[in-house]
Amino acid sequence: MMNNTWKSVLCPIACGVGMLLSASPYSASGKDIEFNTDFLDVKNRDNVNIAQFSRKGFILPGVYLLQIKINGQTLPQEFPVNWVIPEHDPQGSEVCAEPELVTQLGIKPELAEKLVWITHGERQCLAPDSLKGMDFQADLGHSTLLVNLPQAYMEYSDVDWDPPARWDNGIPGIILDYNINNQLRHDQESGSEEQSISGNGTLGANLGAWRLRADWQASYDHRDDDENTSTLHDQSWSRYYAYRALPTLGAKLTLGESYLQSDVFDSFNYIGASVVSDDQMLPPKLRGYAPEIVGIARSNAKVKVSWQGRVLYETQVPAGPFRIQDLNQSVSGTLHVTVEEQNGQTQEFDVNTASVPFLTRPGMVRYKMALGRPQDWDHHPITGTFASAEASWGVTNGWSLYGGAIGESNYQAVALGSGKDLGVVGAVAVDITHSIAHMPQDDGFDGETLQGNSYRISYSRDFDEIDSRLTFAGYRFSEKNFMSMSDYLDAKTYHHLNAGHEKERYTVTYNQNFREQGMSAYFSYSRSTFWDSPDQSNYNLSLSWYFDLGSIKNLSASLNGYRSEYNGDKDDGVYISLSVPWGNDSISYNGTFNGSQHRNQLGYSGHSQNGDNWQLHVGQDEQGAQADGYYSHQGALTDIDLSADYEEGSYRSLGMSLRGGMTLTTQGGALHRGSLAGSTRLLVDTDGIADVPVSGSGSPTSTNVFGKAVIADVGSYSRSLARIDLNKLPEKAEATKSVVQITLTEGAIGYRHFDVVSGEKMMAVFRLADGDFPPFGAEVKNERQQQLGLVADDGNAWLAGVKAGETLKVFWDGAAQCEASLPPTFTPELLANALLLPCKMLEGQPPTAPQKSSPLPAQPLIQEHTQTDGQPVAPVATTTQTPPIPLADNHAVNRKDME
């Protein structure tokens, strides 16, 4: 027991001296420091040997829970760091960098394999001379371990991006994501009633690094009029698959049903396996491209994006221009867009996803490989086994070669191309694809063999001097006998050659900003021609202007025009708007002109502090009076969009969209609002405290009754932050840790814990049965093992988050030593005074506490408190940072502020 006594005495001494050293100019020198032990207010000071503390950089051996800062960059989590006694220096101490810590430093793999390890007891520690120039320094005042590591030893890192060693695969769990749209429409002329319900989403499970997924979609359509009633419904599982990250290869492995991912070949559905270089694993500056869809909705509308007949994306949009930018980049080829207006009209157009091929960095290779059987949407195979492979090689700086091959028994294609960065001229890529297709007689063909070529050129340039960008993405000319794999599979499925296969396809986009004038312009044009069917084209032009008019500030005006040509039908339209601020809201004029149809509207729009948005419009069109409204709410449980339309003498309609999900894990679960189906998310835990506001990069959400919340707006392979809004905490709740960070792999369910306590604040005095007190620095914890405070001198402790009737335990020497019970109820008088709490020694513990010690005078280890009329009052916080205290059994704890 006497040994423990001295440890309890030395802990505050060590920390106090350590802080003095860290603040002293002598700490950086090689000189020893002499101390006057008279300043120590502890018993038996003559028996305290502090000679070792006079040595430069000495830290009392033990385990400290510290933040790790590498070359100024802080790691997401705290780590237990052990200080050990070197064999060559019994009076010294040094950091034991264990393998778990070293793997987080981001050392290059070829260097990590050569590291030398030494043994300290049961611990493996990095030899101090393993890497020349590596240095560890402790900043106990800020609970931080500073690691200096030459940049040449480290993998590439970015401000918001971590190397693979720091990626987190998350925890096991089950997810269910959904996107449901419901529309009701009453036709006033015919009296018919229509209801349309559609939905899609993902069901999945996470096991280690594996993500198991099943995509679903369903629809229900009901029509009721005077003549008949019809109901159509459909439900299907469109895709079963599993995937995981391969960090060492910088790639993604996918098993099951998937879409061919390719930069040179068109996509199709198949079942099999693929290994693909994943751009998401690259730093943000080096990542790839995802398609963007722009258009104009003439009324509140539902926008569907489909590929080869399957819905990939579905959402509700208000009347006016819309832009969809959160599509998955895994699908290549042509996307079909359907805009279903609430007035019953429909727009349709195609969007090509072509982009300028990625210019690979010098000496690097990016690749994509797949093996499997093509199949239809009913999961039936179409042909035999196929294989595909493609790669891009960075030959020199700014010049890349790329190509690939794909084939099965009756179809083969090969592609070869080159990309070149031309400096101020821009970037260009050119490639050619040759195909051979054998059409066997038993499939209804005459046994002919079709051969042809397809040529493609892509160009992109940033005009920095005029703040603009031009992209000529994918002019492609295909000979009549050229067949893509997708064309070949269609021929096999429908037993005839598609007479309308593609001849030309190109997409042009241009962005221009006029920052001084507050103006911007956007233009996109895509066109497809076919050998034996009508051409298709689509263009969008958008002009925006932000300006002031006299004393009226922040006005905005926009002009949007579009034209689409699809299956021989043309659709043209113009949308103009003017918006004027009105307090925190705005009033507006909107005009929509489409052929013989026109609509003029006055509108009022606004938003609330919780992120809700609404729009109200009244106006006139060729039918008569018209009104519509739109409301969007980002709730903690789901995203909700509501819309309503009315047109005099024509129709009235209602629309609703719900997007959200459910996540269940071994650490708990929650309902939550939506993101990309099946994607990455973060489960946060606030120790059972409900209604705690937490947020990621988007709108805040709140924890449920179990103290859990899921943040859905979390990226993959990039550092994500989650934080508690301390200004909106529930009454009597306090957060001692309000910010966490994590870097998750794709599809992971991350988990982070916030230190939150809820309850009363009070001053207490802990007294043992023999009249003594728990030692200085002892921890007070509740039944959930949450730290509520620290014991100061004479058993005094300022506690936060206590609840009536609970049992508190006091810890020292690394274990719970005694416990005290709180009264069943708290009265104002009781909370206003110091409460004496008898602390009963736990079974197996000695009947008496270690000899008490007094704190260091004027030391910063604990917040000061004052007394009035002999009664303690709430402590007054000092501004000095508190270092962690090593415990005797090599467990560490951070000293928390007492209020």
PLM features: residue spans?
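Transmembrane beta-barrel strands of outer-membrane/channel proteins
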Residues: 178-182, 214-218, 253-259, 369-373, ...
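Short, acidic Ser/Thr/Gly-rich low-complexity loop/linker segments typical of extracellular
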Residues: 699-708, 785-796
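Post-signal-peptide, soluble extracytosolic/periplasmic N-terminal scaffold domains
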Residues: 5, 26-287, 596-663, 673, ...
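Extracellular beta-sheet/turn segments enriched in Thr/Pro/Gly and aliphatic residues
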Residues: 144-148, 357-361, 674, 738-759, ...
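Short Pro-Gly-centered beta-turn/loop motif in secreted/extracellular proteins
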Residues: 88-97, 327-332, 708-734, 746, ...
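A short, amphipathic beta-strand motif
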Residues: 68, 293-295, 682-686, 760-770
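Short, ordered, surface-exposed loop/turn motifs in non-cytosolic proteins
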Residues: 60-69, 73-83, 301, 688-698, ...
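Feature captures outer-membrane beta-barrel proteins of Gram-negative bacteria and organelles
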Residues: 167, 197-208, 231-247, 383-405, ...
